[in-house]
Design a protein with these regions (language model features):
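Extreme N-terminal, non-catalytic leader segments
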Residues: 1-8
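Glycine-rich phosphate-binding P-loop
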Residues: 12-26
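NTP-dependent small-molecule kinase module
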Residues: 25, 100-103, 172-215
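Short beta-strand-centered segment that lines the nucleotide-binding/catalytic pocket of NTP-utilizing
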Residues: 34-47
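RNA pseudouridine synthases
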Residues: 105, 117-124
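Conserved phosphate-donor/acceptor-positioning beta-strand/loop module used by diverse small-molecule
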Residues: 124-147, 151-160
Length: 215
């Protein structure tokens, strides 16, 4: 279907507890024998930029604690801030380098990316499938309780905090609403469909969309 594009990417956006990254993304990577990029992307962005991986990791953690993403936007436009600029190691530029790596990787390999606003970063690429995975709140709470061995209150706090961060992060870097279905090619309820069935369904869509190249 896309003869000029030998590789494909699946960009997964997910709510906490839905299993979109911790299960579905990992299983898809195994099925197709390709890499899954999440925090692993920080190392590649560090190598590409010359900025230490520790700074990327610190920025990744700090954004979970800051109010910045709730009050402003820095929509990604593909630009890179040069080393001589005082903003070279700003959170904005660290995101820019992660985005740059994602775009360049698509010329070298197929991969799964979880989060990182990858659906927006790769929005002009025809060889990308964007997927949103969600599930009812109570189901997600129960799943996190079992997965982490924690109580209901802790699970709710964990989910609420992480979902709020992801929503604000996405809005800050894309200017778009995180849960708008029109942002994605495929939207799945992992509770209604089942985690393994989600994997099989996405696998089938990949094979259909990319005309057998992914087999």
């Amino acid at each position: 279907m896309y003869p000029d594009y030998p590789y494909f990417a699946v960009a997964i956006t997910r709510t906490c507890g839905s299993g979109g990254g911790s299960y579905i993304g990992k299983q898809l990577a195994k099925v197709f024998d390709i890499d899954l990029y999440d925090r692993k992307l920080l190392r590649l962005a560090s190598e590409d930029s010359g900025i230490s991986e520790e700074l990327f990791a610190r920025a990744d953690e700090n954004t979970r604690k800051t109010m910045l993403y709730r009050v402003s936007e820095r929509v990604y436009d593909g630009s890179i801030i040069p080393p001589e600029s005082g903003n070279f190691i700003s959170d904005e530029n660290l995101f820019n380098y992660q985005a740059k790596v994602l775009r360049e990787l698509l010329n070298e390999e197929s991969y799964i990316c979880v989060g990182r606003a990858a659906d927006f970063v790769l929005r002009d690429k025809p060889n990308v499938l964007t997927v949103y995975v969600d599930a009812p709140y109570d189901w997600r709470v129960e799943r996190e309780m079992k997965r982490q061995g924690i109580g209901s209150g802790q699970a709710k706090h964990y989910i609420d905090k992480l979902d709020r961060y992801r929503e604000n992060y996405y809005k800050y870097h894309t200017g778009r609403q995180w849960k708008r279905v029109e942002n994605y090619d495929l939207c799945l309820d992992s509770a209604a469909i089942g985690l393994d069935n989600c994997v099989e369904l996405i696998k089938k869509v990949i094979e259909l969309k990319f005309d057998g190249k992914a087999k």
